[in-house]
Amino acid sequence: MATTKGFDCNKESKIKRIALSIQYQGSNFSGWQRQKVGHTIQAILEDAIFSLDSSKPAKVVAAGRTDAGVHAAGQVVHFDSFGPIPVHRWPSALNGRLPEAIRVRDSVEQSLDWHACHSAVYRRYRYIIYNGCTPNLFLNPWTWHKYQYQLDEELMEEAAKGLIGMHDFSAFQRSGSNRTHAFTTIQEVKLVRHGDLLVFDIQASGFLYGMVRLLVGQLVSIGEHRLSINDFETRWKLKLRSEVKEAAPARGLCFIRAGYKESIFRENIVFDSFPGFLLLTNDPPERII
C-alpha cells in the first residue's frame, strides 16, 4: 500500500481546499508565477505539494503575484488536496521539502468557493528605504540604500496621501500586464522614519504590475527635491507613463499580508517572525541601528 510519510495514499478522501500562510526571501527567485524558464515560488511549492499528494497535479493560487526579488511575510495561497494528509500537518510536511528561503507558517481548511485571490478585500505591501550615509551589510537584502540626499519624508508622505481612493493608475503600470484596466482603490498609505530607515506601507484592493516599485521611485525623487508634488500629480492623473522612469529595487519590497472578510489564520502569525524589527511589525522601534 502506498504511503507518504505515514499517510495512507490509497485512503479515499474528500476534496479539501487548503489555505496556507507562507513567507519567502525572494532574492534568488524569479518571482511568484510559474514560468517556462526560471526558479519561481509557485513552481517550487506546486512540486512539493505534488510530491506529497500525487493524485492530481497541484495548482496553487496566490493572493498577490510578486515580482522577481520581492519578499513575502504573509502571502496567502490555496490549493485543492485530494489526499489523506490532515490539514494541520501540511506546514511540517511541506517545510521538509521546501528550500529554506520558503517557509509555510500555517494551514487551514476553507470552503471550496473560497479563493486566495478573489476573496481578498485588500493586499498590503511595505517598502523599506535605508537612508543612512554608510552601507549596512545586514540591511542590504531587505532595503534600498538611498543616500545622495537626506530624504524629506514629510513631502513624500504628503504626495502619497493624494493617491488614496479609486483612480486610474496607468502611470504606475509596467508593460506586460494582462489587465484590461488600470483602476484600483488605494485604502491607506503611511510613511514613517525610524532613524535611518523610511518605512512605507501601502494598502489597496489590488495592485498593478510593478506599481509599488514605480511609485516608490517617484516618491524618492520627491524626497530628494528633484520632483515637485504638483509635477508628480500631473504625471499620474494624466497617465503620463513615459514620465515615470525609475523603479525602486525589488529587494526593498515585501508583501506583508492579504485581508479577508473573516480572519483565517492565527492572530499575529505574520508579525512574530524575523526580521520583525525591520519588515513585519506595525511599529518598529525608534532606534534600530
From Swiss-Prot:
Gene Ontology MF terms in the entry: RNA binding; tRNA pseudouridine(38-40) synthase activity
Isomerase as UniProt keyword: yes
Entry binding sites for substrate: Y125
PANTHER family (alphabetical): PSEUDOURIDYLATE SYNTHASE, TRNA PSEUDOURIDINE SYNTHASE-LIKE 1
Family recorded in the similarity comment: Belongs to the tRNA pseudouridine synthase TruA family.
Residues at the catalytic site: D67
Top-level taxon in the UniProt lineage: Bacteria
Record keywords, A-Z: Isomerase, tRNA processing
Functional description taken from the UniProt entry: Formation of pseudouridine at positions 38, 39 and 40 in the anticodon stem and loop of transfer RNAs.
Keyword Endoplasmic reticulum listed: no
Catalysed conversion reaction: uridine(38/39/40) in tRNA = pseudouridine(38/39/40) in tRNA
Protein's recorded name: tRNA pseudouridine synthase A
EC number: 5.4.99.12
Oligomer status and interactors: Homodimer.
Any GO BP: tRNA pseudouridine synthesis
